[in-house]
Amino acid sequence: MDPFSILLTLTLIILAQNAVRIVGKSQIHQSIWNLYLRYSNDQQILKLRNLKAESYDVYKQRSNTSAQDEYAKWTKLNRKYDQLQTEIKAVSDQVSQQQQAIEKYLGLAISVTTTLPLWLFRFKYRKQPLFYFPKDTFPSYLEWILSFPSVPQGSIGIMFWILLLNKFVSNLEFIVKTFSTKVEKPVPIVKVEDLSPK
């Protein structure tokens, strides 16, 4: 693989890794779970959806029924509503277990896709220089640090490139957060003498 392809691939992987970090795995899990709930044909999810709709209808009927004037009808609706709530809780527990299993595999998939390629690149291309500096650009000790651990002196290797990219993304994130937060306008301090009549 040529150095430019390595640089580009590493940049994309590190940007994806930092995007996951910034957005947060829990937010990604929740978004994917919401999509799964919306478009899934799973029987438990469909049953839960139907039970909630039926429970809402019974609740509306019960609310529109006077407990004093139509006590028998209201009691029947109340019992049905309580029964539906019990069923909803049981089905919700099953769906919650399903959600935990999906989140477990999703978290594993995110971790593998964002960290494994970096480790493979570090191992496979650790001795390949990504680009060279002109001779005597930096002092020899600095060139040695930039080429650490195993590329020729006077070049930048994959380890230092990953370090630079991560630092760049974290600094960029800091700048964006700093300038995007709204700062309250300071309230002027009024001295007691200013309030006294003249």
Curated annotation (Swiss-Prot):
One GO MF term attached to the UniProt entry: protein-membrane adaptor activity
Coiled-coil positions: 73-106
Annotated localization: Endoplasmic reticulum membrane; Golgi apparatus membrane
Regions crossing the membrane: 7-26, 111-131, 156-172
Keyword Transport carried by entry: yes
Membrane-topology descriptor: Multi-pass membrane protein
Pfam families in UniProt: CHD5 (PF04420)
A GO cellular-component term linked to this record: Golgi membrane
Stretches of the chain found on the membrane's Lumenal side: 1-6, 132-155
InterPro entries: Get1, Get1_fungi, Helix_hairpin_bin_sf
Main location: endoplasmic reticulum
Gene3D superfamilies in the record: Helix hairpin bin (1.10.287.660)
Cytoplasmic domain ranges by topology: 27-110, 173-198
Subunit note: Component of the Golgi to ER traffic (GET) complex, which is composed of GET1, GET2 and GET3. Within the complex, GET1 and GET2 form a heterotetramer which is stabilized by phosphatidylinositol binding and which binds to the GET3 homodimer.
Function (record text): Required for the post-translational delivery of tail-anchored (TA) proteins to the endoplasmic reticulum. Together with GET2, acts as a membrane receptor for soluble GET3, which recognizes and selectively binds the transmembrane domain of TA proteins in the cytosol. The GET complex cooperates with the HDEL receptor ERD2 to mediate the ATP-dependent retrieval of resident ER proteins that contain a C-terminal H-D-E-L retention signal from the Golgi to the ER.
Protein name, as recorded: Golgi to ER traffic protein 1
Gene transcribed to yield this protein: GET1
